[in-house]
């Protein structure tokens, strides 16, 4: 998700690095960076955090307002440098400043603590618990009562991206907040287009933003995965509500399966970079594999056997295509060997798929090739924008895959870097500049969600969509896979018998 160039038309320069560089020079001028004392944050951080009421709305806090302030423990109430408190009363749209013993502020703080206690707060120590608390509260403030999960709290971030929202739903489910998770999934189901896909982003009222931005097909993979995760972790809380979400999950899975071409891969298009690729890209193929596996398992659990078989077969076909087209060249961004390492390689690992040694090696290689001097990573090796700026969602993906793999050393290193580059209010920003300063807006919902999942993975394995297998339930059907090879002017047919998934 590349929010830093929303609405700027910058995607036009995605395939033309030289033009992009020239534009950057023209924008920044030739005078270099402003001196360190020119402003509090050398990077243009717009929002440092939020205060708000989970049941209604939230108010952004600027970096200047955040100076010297800190939240009361496990709350959305700010203690100001002078000792007063600032919070958003229930049902209000404006924050108020009150004395330190104000009953309304105390009640607001108690409400958020009670909400946190209703779920789990991941982490293996007090520091990680505080990070999780803040991330959960920030996600709750970014989620409107109707389930609209906003990407961020400022201007061009105040929209719903289906990918980001799906991750936020999974983070809520992973921490026991299944009601919040359901509301997000219900919103996405209601916003789904008639063809089973989604537009790139949506307004908070569920209407699509039709600004010419290309659709990102990965949504039809992320949504079924999120529904599956909510369902399998919810126990009795989800049993009676799954049928309301199943039609949208089925529509997304149908679209994912139908998108696979003769090569078994989805077509090229806009990935999470929000830039078009001519070749099939990993940022789409991997989520679709995850979503198809999740949909197959969900259909099986719900007794929709024909759907389960279709999605299982599509997932197997896509899996074979990924191994054939991406694995031999190290899982780069696209099927082109020169497309460079990409953070999307993490989508092939737990908790999105079972562990594979080759994928783990590719992740380690990508981390080495992408790591910047400031310690974070950009989306990919051939990222056409500022090469000194790290993006926190992509950095967090490396933390998640390391944590899910049980690689405590790598996970701690990535999580430590992310924690050290939060805003003064503990929110994860979208970007971190070359000087290590937070940039753009915070909190960023996608990063907050991924970090929560990484911390949750430290407490135990996260559910992973199973690779579909044949079972007595489907009658043990056998699929004949016929491949042809040209031999001496004729066709030699090789027939392989395999039990269907």
Predicted feature locations:
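C-terminal capping/lid segments that line or modulate ligand- or cofactor-binding pockets
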Residues: 168, 213-230, 337-357, 394-484
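Structural helix-adjacent loops and short alpha-helical linkers that scaffold large soluble proteins
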Residues: 120-129, 173-185, 230-250, 296-316, ...
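Low-complexity, Ser/Thr/Pro/Gly-enriched N-terminal "stalk/linker" regions
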Residues: 29-158, 182-183, 187, 196-198, ...
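C-terminal membrane-anchoring or membrane-association module
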Residues: 489-501
